[in-house]
Curated annotation (Swiss-Prot):
Signal peptide: none annotated. Pfam families: Ribosomal_L17. The gene is rplQ. Part of the 50S ribosomal subunit. Contacts protein L32. It comes from Ruegeria sp. (strain TM1040) (Silicibacter sp.). Belongs to the bacterial ribosomal protein bL17 family. This is Large ribosomal subunit protein bL17. GO terms for molecular function: structural constituent of ribosome. One of its GO terms (cellular component) is cytosolic large ribosomal subunit. GO terms for biological process: translation. The keyword Ribosomal protein applies.
Length: 141
């Protein structure tokens, strides 16, 4: 029987799962949309929902709690400066999961997880900025 089985193990140790979801949460906060397997997306949703709730609180203790779950300071900054105010009036349901077919190779069910009122320009913004910087350096030479 599967009574009181609260989460998916995803064939990983506790430390590996913790690192996986920390990395995935950071990627979702940075890009506002990521593609992953359906079970990972379903497990990531409550983690992100709790992060947004912390960001809506906005105090120092909430910031430290979020920083303990995320690996990079820029993700914490975006969470509290951009995403928290964006979802101030929304009572939950900050992310959506869209099914995206099956992965070639192992037929794993794929999903796209994204923020509900996401900024479309956020996905790939870092890459575009980096390429523009490289192009500017090449033009100077």
């Amino acid at each position: 029987m599967r009574h009181a089985r609260g989460y998916r193990r995803l064939n990983r140790t506790h430390e590996h799962r913790k690192a996986l979801f920390s990395n995935m949460a950071g990627s979702l906060i940075e890009h506002e949309q990521i593609k992953t397997t359906l079970p990972k997306a379903k497990e990531l949703r409550p983690i992100i929902e709790k992060m947004i709730t912390l960001a809506k609180r906005g105090d120092l203790h909430a910031r430290r709690q979020a920083a303990s779950k995320l690996k990079e300071d820029k993700d914490v900054a975006k969470l509290f400066d951009v995403l928290g105010p964006r979802y101030k009036d929304r009572q939950g349901g900050y992310v959506r999961i869209l099914k995206a077919g099956f992965r070639y190779g192992d037929m794993a069910p794929m999903a796209i997880i994204e923020f509900v009122d996401r900024d479309v320009s956020a996905k790939g913004a870092a890459d575009k900025a980096r390429l523009a910087e490289i192009e500017a350096v090449e033009d100077e030479e």
